[in-house]
Amino acid sequence: MPGTVATLRFQLLPPEPDDAFWGAPCEQPLERRYEALPALVCIMCCLFGVVYCFFGYRCFKAVLFLTGLLFGSVVIFLLCYRERVLETQLSAGASAGIALGIGLLCGLVAMLVRSVGLFLVGLLLGLLLAAAALLGSAPYYQPGSVWGPLGLLLGGGLLCALLTLRWPRPLTTLATAVTGAALIATAADYFAELLLLARYAVERLRAAPVPPLCWRSWALLALWPLLSLMGVLVQWRVTTERDSHTEVVISRQRRRVQLMRIRQQEERKEKRRKKRPPRALPRGSRAPPRPGPPDPAYRRRPVPIKRFNGDILSPSYIQSFRDRQTGSSLSSFMASPTDADYEYGSRGPLTACSGPPVRV
């Protein structure tokens, strides 16, 4: 019976804090032993945190994609790694591969569907603000069960998500600044305390009793709101001064509405024109005459044929005229002058020709 009670007590109540788990006291220096893969992941988080914190709203599509990727990957990894899938316990590598694939799909959906992306951005903002409230209230408030932190996380996340859908630009700027500052603070926590502050936050969310934080942890925790404030100021004054993704979406919607109205007006005019009956003529009036064929006088005349002075003279007459000029016209006149036809070769007297002259 005492063994059963001890087992139930271990399952229901949070574990006691372990001094070896939390490392050395504040007076002693920490023994830093870094590993390659966690250090690389923290460096990447620091770089993404800088982009998020100071260029979040300008890189709007990239922020939506990364937020969807983060949510999808984390949720699917926890489900696959903690639970049995098809009665099989998956390894960490298989769970990471499945989580990465589904995370990419969630990132694409968040980037393409603007409302989904804004909802996830606001939800992330609410979760981070609730976690910061739990960390800040550690010296004054200790939750009795896990339902208190869980309700605070869900309530803050849904509230910020709805507010982000209502006011996208200011809350997206705030969300990206807070998220980037959290990533930078987490990377600094790894290199300073080997993620001691992150483990403290997890234990606070589980409502487990934890020892008080060291001054190094409080300094890293104070870095978070300071970087968030700097990120908001930089984005408000520099990076988002001329960029407004909301106005772009509204202008596109207005353009589509205007085009739709113009098309509807044209369709209505076309239907009215087709349904309109022909106009009836008044009584006593005649219909206008139809245009007939054009007047023959206005037709184009043919080009007149060109004629020359020698067209009506025969070649024999021209030759006799030339002989007269040379002085032999007398002898040729006494003889029987003949006229050779130019075309048929017939020979006849020139004086015997009676009738109209032949035109050549």
UniProtKB/Swiss-Prot annotation:
Biased amino acid composition, Polar residues: 326-335
Membrane topology recorded in Swiss-Prot or TrEMBL: Multi-pass membrane protein
Spans annotated as Disordered: 261-304, 324-360
Source domain of life: Eukaryota
Sorted UniProt keywords: Cell membrane, Cytoplasmic vesicle, Developmental protein, Membrane, Transmembrane, Transmembrane helix, Wnt signaling pathway
Subunit structure: Interacts with LRP6.
Protein name in the entry: Transmembrane protein 198
Natural source organism: Bos taurus (Bovine)
Lineage, uppermost ranks: Eukaryota, Metazoa, Chordata, Craniata, Vertebrata
